[in-house]
Amino acid sequence: LGYHMVGDVHLGDWGLQMGLIIEELRDRKPELVYFDESYTGEYPTEPPFTISELEDIYPTASKKAKEDECFKERAQTATFKLQNGYAPFTAIWKHIMNVSLADLKRNYGNLDVHFDLWKGESDAEPYIPWLIQDLQDKGLAYESQGALVVDIAEPTDSKELPPCIVRKSDGAALYATSDSGTILEREKDFAPVKYI
């Protein structure tokens, strides 16, 4: 009681799902300039899909990745490129976010659900290099099979817990990484007493 609450929708906007959408879009519309490596112009301001198309693209891509290892690897590569600032995929990501956010805000509004913040995993990205460096400097993160991991097991745990991966062997970040970055951002912006 008496706490000031700050609500955040915390969008899942930075992981493999983005790579899946990008690669499914490539399969459906290979003629788009985003997939032309020789293209040097400005990217279109209009999205190359509607919300209805996007609602079909993701589940199709997710299913395809479970059945087709090559497609899954393409999506992982696209995710890595996005997370490292590859301009064509950043442009697609902005379209995904604009189309998705407009739809989400409308749907949440219809339910009379409101958030103070509309942030996502991508907002934690600036904190991730510092987070990883801090974990390494403190001797908490170490390499295991090419990935960077942190032990999370406690002596009182009733079952064995594997280390938490903070950076995959291909250099990509995971949910645990962006969630930790999000906590750092919240600490900086709000210094909260409690997380719910």
Task: Map each language-model feature to its residues.
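NTP-dependent nucleotidyl-transfer catalytic core
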Residues: 1-196
